[in-house]
Amino acid sequence: MPRPISAEIDLEALRHNLGVMRSKAAGRALWAVVKANAYGHGLDNAVTAFADADGLATIDLCDAEIVRRCGWHKRILLLEGFFDAADIEPLQTLKVETVVHSPWQIAILRAAKPKDVRVHVKVNSGMNRLGFRPAEAPVAAAQLAAIPGVRVMDYVTHFANAEQSAVHAPVTVADQLAAMGGLAREQACLANTGAILFHPEVQGQAVRAGGALYGVSPDEAVTSGALGLIPAMTLGAEIIALQQVSPGESVGYGSRWTAQRPSRIAVVACGYADGYPRSMPDGAPVWVEGSQAPLAGAVSMDMLTIDVTDIPEADVGSKVELWGRHIAVNDLARRCGTIGYEL
């Protein structure tokens, strides 16, 4: 019998979330971002659930090949662009569009003499990660347009702080829009998830929706439910053992948690090797038998322990939700100093 743990993906939730983001996009073309194996939800599931998206955006040609094999016939965009001259031929074979963010990529395209490559010029409007400075971007676009077989589609940028709670960040959406200048009024794909949800002033003819498609709010101060989003992944497991622990006894590595009363401790078949963070502190909620039980002790590689003293129904075989509909992944992420997307 397999170990009792699974990540269940709700395709209807994915479809619902796409509909929410589609309505927020207000008629603009929508790229569904499926990088990192569709944020851990599976590229095959993404192809099925995001059939109504205008295109899929990912990181490399391996992903593009997978989604083509899964039956995706619409547009595909490489968000980080191509990495080597050898990528140009499969770009064309797979009919994949690519971001261009650096002069070396222009040189590769010029030397490759492509027959049909569609490019999106990345603009560094203040995030300082990828892209040409706003003053350099039109020059890059002109150089690309001069290469036979290359078609420039639009300008693309990415906001560093598009969350609703980031209005006082060192670099704001307004700062980056100002840096874009007239480029923001040309053919452009500007809005990421946060900008789609919280910044209607960001225009452009296309948007890129990421984590919200999977039911995760981009702002930990705003719940997914408040945005109309439904968590699409449920990480579930089962209780595999129970321990009666006396006051003064401790649980787990490092003896981090000590019982203050006679306690009933449940051992759950999930650990950090399964993606549940080892850094999760005591007290983090786990859903079992219709109630929340607190984490009690350090997370092990393939087990964790929870205090079910106040949940008498909890027993060996009881189903446990680590995150999903009842336990918000953003809440867990905040407790261990990361973001929901990482989990």
Predicted regions span which residues?
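Fold-independent oxyanion-binding glycine-rich loops
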Residues: A36, I59-L61, G81, H101-P103, ...
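Active-site loop/helix belt of alpha/beta enzymes
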Residues: P2-R3, A36-A51, E89-L94, W104-R118, ...
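C-terminal accessory subdomain/extension
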Residues: Q244-L343
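Small-residue-enriched segments and motifs
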Residues: A237-I239, A293-P294
